[in-house]
A protein has these predicted regions:
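Active-site-adjacent core segments of small-molecule enzymes
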Residues: 1-324
Length: 324
């Protein structure tokens, strides 16, 4: 081989190919802003929740847990929504899921869960026999499994999904007091449970989802692009559940396989997120979100699985050559 210029170009092309993510490979990035409705300075010193006269820049990424770039958006799946808020004090990541609970509480069960979501390669789809064997062996996974196999697992629009932070955060105020917090992003115009007037929960029927998978596999991404082009910018209200840290020793509130009781800890409307422009793919793929990437006034609740998840996000970014 003597055409060295051709060889050089070939290696350059191969070097430009991005290394794929382990999970959430198919995604789309956006930019926008976040503004709070009221100050939460009695709970946290984080400026993003204290300064009412400011709008904070935001970068966000919508994605799907299973599959790759060619996977249909309406395939039964768990969707992801990661938001990075920029302030003068630091950066704050809010990593959310389309389901309010997860399958496991212990990090040592992760590899077995991963095997149940491996048909040919890691996290390419649900291996149904392995998956249901996993659920039988780990009954705490049933809650998440039932939600996944309901209409909540079939979505054709990122704009219409309710997003939940499965990982618990800690708010720290100026007095040194601590509060446990879980977030949820609700599409603007819905109530705290994601319901519109008439109590019709937004979801897709399986037959419609199957049709859309063949008709337009990029339905969710196209929906975002169309909305931005028409000026119907996606908007989500942030709701927070706040718990005194004294409850942290109670087993029920340590598990991510159950939701917090809303009668005891009612969600409070906190602010509005509006996404106003699409981000080029080469820029959004250089982002690495992590549940522990937080600034002053907020920290990650340091249980075993949260620490593992934070490490996994950062290690995945390092493997792709990007950092938080």
């Amino acid at each position: 081989m003597t055409d060295f210029l051709l060889v050089e170009q070939l290696h350059r092309m191969m070097g430009e190919l991005p290394r794929p993510r382990l999970m959430y490979r198919k995604g789309i990035g956006m930019r926008g802003y976040f503004k709070i409705y009221r100050s939460f300075e009695e709970y946290t010193s984080a400026d993003i929740f204290c300064e009412m006269d400011r709008s904070f820049p935001v970068r966000a990424r919508f994605s799907a847990l299973l599959g790759d770039g060619g996977t249909a958006d309406t395939r039964r799946n768990i969707k992801g929504f990661a938001v990075r808020l920029y302030s003068g004090a630091g950066e704050y990541d809010v990593v959310c899921s389309s389901l309010p609970v997860f399958f496991i509480n212990r990090s040592r069960d992760f590899l077995e869960l991963a095997e149940s979501m491996r048909c040919r390669t890691w996290f390419d789809g649900i291996a149904f026999e392995k998956f249901w064997r996993f659920v039988v062996k780990h009954p705490e996974a049933l809650h998440c499994a039932l939600r996944l196999f309901s209409s909540e697992g079939l979505t054709a629009s990122y704009r219409r999904i309710c997003w939940y932070s499965v990982h618990t955060c800690v708010w720290n105020n100026e007095k040194g007091e601590q509060f446990l917090v879980r977030y949820r992003w609700i599409p603007e115009g819905n109530d705290r449970n994601g319901l519109k007037e008439g109590n019709d929960r937004i979801g897709e029927e399986r037959i419609i989802a199957d049709f859309m998978a063949g008709y337009n596999p990029d339905a969710a991404q196209d929906d975002l692009e169309t909305a931005v082009a028409e000026g119907a910018f996606p908007a989500f209200e942030l709701w927070v559940q706040i718990m005194d840290a004294s409850y942290s020793s109670h087993p029920e509130y340590q598990r991510r396989t159950v939701s917090w009781n809303e009668a005891i800890f009612p969600p409070v409307r906190a602010g509005i997120l509006k996404l106003t422009e699409l981000e080029p793919l080469e820029q959004s793929e250089k982002l690495c979100f992590s549940p522990g990437h937080l600034g002053p006034g907020i920290s990650l609740w340091g249980d075993e699985f949260s620490d593992f998840a934070d490490y996994a996000h950062k290690a995945g970014g390092a493997e792709r050559g990007v950092r938080t």
